């Protein structure tokens, strides 16, 4: 009887851990302090290689074609400078920005995100530095018109 109880508990623990695992987040960084053309080229190549599907080709060329996400839903891009780091959260399947992380004037990491594109739990996995209390959903949507309106600019500017 004890073996059945142990087996059942082990099965529940394994199932629970499978239910709660989050995709690992890939982070790619560009150091903006004295960057070189080679560093920038390497940075762009890392992004391309991370999202491309090696089995997809465009017109028989070696141009990277975005494949379905196989390494997690999001990609973290960090831009480092002498004054700090700004991080972008990108959707892996289209490279759209869904969130960003920056330190505010009080040295607190704050994450801002499009609620329709990423959940708070996914944001926590992407930017663990920003606690749930320091996450803020943006008050506008991710389409260009909404962003322009919120920034108070137009395409003519």
UniProtKB/Swiss-Prot annotation:
Which EC class, in a word?
A: hydrolase
Query: What family classification does the UniProt entry report for this protein?
Result: Belongs to the ribosome-inactivating protein family. Type 1 RIP subfamily.
Q: Which SUPFAM superfamilies match?
A: Ribosome inactivating proteins (RIP) (SSF56371)
Q: Which domain of life is it from?
A: Eukaryota
Species of origin:
Saponaria officinalis
Specify the signal sequence span. Answer: 1-24
Q: Which GO terms describe its molecular function?
A: rRNA N-glycosylase activity; toxin activity
- Which EC numbers characterise this protein's activity in its record? 3.2.2.22
Quote the catalytic activity from the record: Endohydrolysis of the N-glycosidic bond at one specific adenosine on the 28S rRNA
Q: What protein name applies here?
A: Ribosome-inactivating protein saporin-4
């Amino acid at each position: 009887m004890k073996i059945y109880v142990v087996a059942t508990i082990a099965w529940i623990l394994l199932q629970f851990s499978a239910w709660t695992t989050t995709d690992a987040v890939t982070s790619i960084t560009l150091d903006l302090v004295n960057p070189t053309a080679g560093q920038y080229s390497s940075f762009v190549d890392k992004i391309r290689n991370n999202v491309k599907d090696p089995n997809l080709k465009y017109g028989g060329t070696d141009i990277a074609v975005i494949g379905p996400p196989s390494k997690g839903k999001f990609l973290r891009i960090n831009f480092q400078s002498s004054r700090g780091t700004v991080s972008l959260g990108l959707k892996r399947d289209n490279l759209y920005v869904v969130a960003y992380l920056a330190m505010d004037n009080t040295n607190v990491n704050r994450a801002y995100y499009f609620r329709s594109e990423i959940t708070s739990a996914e944001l926590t996995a992407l930017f663990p530095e920003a606690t749930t209390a320091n996450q803020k959903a943006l008050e506008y949507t991710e389409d260009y018109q909404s962003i322009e309106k919120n920034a108070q600019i137009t395409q003519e500017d």
